[in-house]
Amino acid sequence: MSRKSIAEKQVAKPDPIYRNRLVNMLVNRILKNGKKSLAYRILYKAMKNIKQKTKKNPLFVLRQAVRKVTPNVTVKARRIDGSTYQVPLEIKSTQGKALAIRWLLGASRKRSGQNMAFKLSYELIDAARDNGIAIRKKEETHKMAEANRAFAHFR
């Protein structure tokens, strides 16, 4: 058995304007090549756009979008006796939230549009309204897990 101590999970720090951890998690996923100020600028423009379009608190829309995209289960490929099975697994809320953020950003990058701030804002608005590419991804994952429920005992 290892004598090394287990590293403690780091808690995400809140961002300077909204004082919210979720916003900071999103900024860290937008981040490319260490350009954090650009990532903040993209997100804050997206939040401003959300406020103009929906006339609601952008933080509320963001939370709602992440909550609706967060998956409960996921599938993991397990190789047993030479054949690969997609085994459904329940995931923790933190991991689900991280997946939701990743899916939202992936979906907004795929969107056609002017710039990342607009694409992100429209994807967040769509996700909060229960449609959009990220919501489809979640439903697809849940369907996959449901279809492979027979392999759940291979955990």
From Swiss-Prot:
Protein location: Plastid, Chloroplast
Protein name in UniProt: Small ribosomal subunit protein uS7c
SUPFAM superfamilies linked to this entry: Ribosomal protein S7
Native organism: Marchantia polymorpha (Common liverwort)
Family: Belongs to the universal ribosomal protein uS7 family.
Record's keyword annotation contains Transferase: no
CDD domains: uS7_Chloroplast
Gene Ontology biological-process annotations: translation
Function: One of the primary rRNA binding proteins, it binds directly to 16S rRNA where it nucleates assembly of the head domain of the 30S subunit.
One GO location term (cellular component): chloroplast
Pfam families attached to this UniProt entry: Ribosomal_S7 (PF00177)
Subunit details: Part of the 30S ribosomal subunit.
GO molecular function, one term: structural constituent of ribosome
Alphabetical UniProt keywords: Chloroplast, Plastid, Ribonucleoprotein, Ribosomal protein, RNA-binding, rRNA-binding
Classification via Gene3D superfamilies: Ribosomal protein S7 domain
